Amino acid sequence: MKIPQEFDTIRPWEPEDLPEVFDRLLSNDQFKQVLAYLYPQVPFEMIAQKLKACKTNLDFQLAFAYDFVQGILKKAATGCEMDCAAIDNTRNYTFISNHRDIVLDSASLDVMLIDNGFKTTCEIAIGDNLLSLPWVKDLVRVNKAFIVERALSMRQMLMSSKRLSDYMHFAIKEKNENIWIAQREGRAKDSDDRTQKSILQMMAMGGEGSIIERLKQLHLVPLSISYEYDPCDFLKAKEYQQKRDVEGWKKGPMDDLISMQTGIFGYKGHVHYHAAPCIDEYLDTLDPEMPKQELFNTIAAHLDHEIHSHYRLYPGNYVALDLLENTEAHASEYTPEDKARFEKYIAGQLAKIQLPDKDEAFLKEKILAMYANPVRNFLATK
């Protein structure tokens, strides 16, 4: 397929790009080290041969990514499933979800789509702040990622957003791909998931017709992702204290790398994906004459309601809310054993935090809020 040249800097690698990209990857020492770590018993030549046999991005995902993610979920989760009864696996959609884990939110979704009979996986929106190493950028583009450019001037940001939106519309309409995009820029560190209006505004820059028609062309599906345990909870809490105590503190590239590694390999308990109905029909019920900002706010609120109301809540979520509010209002949702297990887990996560002036009470409150907020949001939809 002929891809417009304007997308060259952000699009995933296409099948015709793959031979050259594979050669680049296979000659990179860091990539070789990763392969040696992941496949200690397999000769490099055999992996190279298997990689070069992949003619499409989906071939690569089925040959490498699928088994890798399945292996992670087997070791670091007690189960992972997706409820997609509300959507049609013969169609393609833009999944817009809450964002917990840098890598696995979208990687596990790909596995779930394959397991649920979808004809293809997702093209994934990923920020260029996570792609400082050229070989990592190559690898994610092989794995069907398209790039969201960050840290731009206002003028550059407008041009970049328009190109990004045009590409998303092209991927859905012309390439017949699915797309995954987070409902906000970056993870919601406190798990209080809210759709950023700016994401919807960006998506409505591409396509044709009114705002409602443009968003309908992307076939948006609100997706709720629920992890029983977030392996990065202690890192997120640590970040809160660093931001509080150190003026102008900012994450470095190593922080993202540690979060990615911890998120992939850390224990997650149960993981659940729930796809709400595609919002095309809902969009048809809206008044197209509504003022633009009100329209975006209304659509964002609908997405939030769908995501919040379809969370899978675990006993630990209710324990966290009761501990935070010093009550037993939700004690019917957990047993004394559940509570003891969760409190032990929290103590273990707090013990991992290394800080010079460690504020235990503040850190504990932040971690508990991460587990309590999904309950608050879920209850607010009832």
Predicted regions located by residue number:
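Soluble or luminal CAZymes and related metallo-dependent hydrolases
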Residues: 64, 160-164, 295, 299
